[in-house]
């Protein structure tokens, strides 16, 4: 029996999320069905992070145990030849039986993309949130992020329906960067609450539009004012960038940002 780890990408707009669900197509079910076809074994996969419906992944990490005699480094090619074009396997490696895609991760990295141009862009529509009620003040939005790094209770940013026992988690790094009309919000944390990133982005947009101040933003999460956090960003602008592990077992992940860099030029 071998434990195999994969780095995968998927277009979340075609799936109900990572996790298996009744009467819906998930990434997990699609991959497990493919593994069954090539091995005739019922395989259970485990992911570093469970993305919601519509959320993309550029460097998701999963693992599974399998008793099937093909070279480990061939799993990517074998699976890609059978999977739909909306899922790609970038790399396959053998790992120790004690290694776990979720529990061995030091932190996860999510990125949210906002297109703040007056004119929507067809080629960015699937991968970003086109939001233009007014020009977003990225300076105020960045100021609002002050104090979020570290271990905190982010209950205000947790959507209903979570099965986590605690809303406390540790943000390793959080930053906001604007390039022309694209705003990228990067969050690295040991774990993420249900709907956490999209809730944070929804509130940051209110700051950028001068509907609330950076102090009000901070007050809402510090004082756990969940009832005031009503706005949430749509799923399509969110991407699971990668997971980082103490031992660098992959050639591509950890060293490279697998998320494409979008640039808008030519109109304003």
From Swiss-Prot:
Residues annotated as the enzyme's active site: 52 (nucleophile)
Organism superkingdom: Bacteria
Catalytic activity: uridine(38/39/40) in tRNA = pseudouridine(38/39/40) in tRNA
Residues annotated to bind substrate: 110
Enzyme class: isomerase
Ranges that cross the membrane: none
UniProt keyword list: Isomerase, tRNA processing
CDD domains: PseudoU_synth_EcTruA
GO molecular function: RNA binding; tRNA pseudouridine(38-40) synthase activity
GO biological-process terms attached to the record: tRNA pseudouridine synthesis
Pfam families listed in its UniProt record: PseudoU_synth_1
Entry EC number(s): 5.4.99.12
Job of this protein: Formation of pseudouridine at positions 38, 39 and 40 in the anticodon stem and loop of transfer RNAs.
Subunit text: Homodimer.
Record-linked HAMAP family: TruA (MF_00171)
Family: Belongs to the tRNA pseudouridine synthase TruA family.
Protein name: tRNA pseudouridine synthase A
């Amino acid at each position: 029996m071998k434990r195999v780890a994969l780095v995968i990408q998927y277009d979340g707009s075609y799936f109900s999320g990572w996790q298996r669900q009744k009467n819906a197509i998930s990434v997990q079910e699609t991959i497990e069905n493919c593994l069954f076809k090539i091995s005739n074994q019922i395989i259970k996969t485990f992911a570093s992070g469970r993305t919601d419906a519509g959320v993309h992944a550029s460097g998701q990490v999963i693992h599974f145990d399998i008793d099937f005699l093909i070279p480990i480094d061939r799993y990517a090619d074998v699976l890609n030849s059978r999977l739909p074009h909306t899922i790609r396997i970038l790399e396959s490696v053998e790992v120790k039986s004690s290694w776990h895609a979720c529990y061995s991760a030091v932190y996860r990295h999510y990125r949210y993309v906002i297109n703040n141009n007056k004119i929507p862009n067809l080629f960015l529509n699937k991968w970003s949130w086109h939001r233009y009620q007014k020009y977003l003040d990225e300076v105020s939005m960045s100021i609002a992020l002050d104090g979020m790094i570290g271990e905190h209770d982010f209950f205000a940013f947790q959507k209903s329906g979570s099965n986590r026992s605690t809303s406390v988690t540790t943000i390793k790094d959080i930053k906001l960067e604007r390039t022309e009309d694209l705003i990228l919000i990067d969050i690295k944390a040991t774990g993420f609450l249900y709907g956490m990133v999209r809730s944070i982005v929804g509130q940051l947009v209110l700051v950028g539009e001068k509907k609330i101040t950076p102090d009000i933003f901070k007050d809402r999460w510090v004082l756990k004012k969940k009832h005031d956090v009503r706005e949430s960003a749509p799923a399509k602008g969110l991407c699971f960038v990668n997971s980082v592990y103490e031992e660098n077992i992959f050639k591509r992940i950890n060293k490279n940002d697998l998320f494409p860099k979008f640039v808008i030029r030519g109109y304003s």
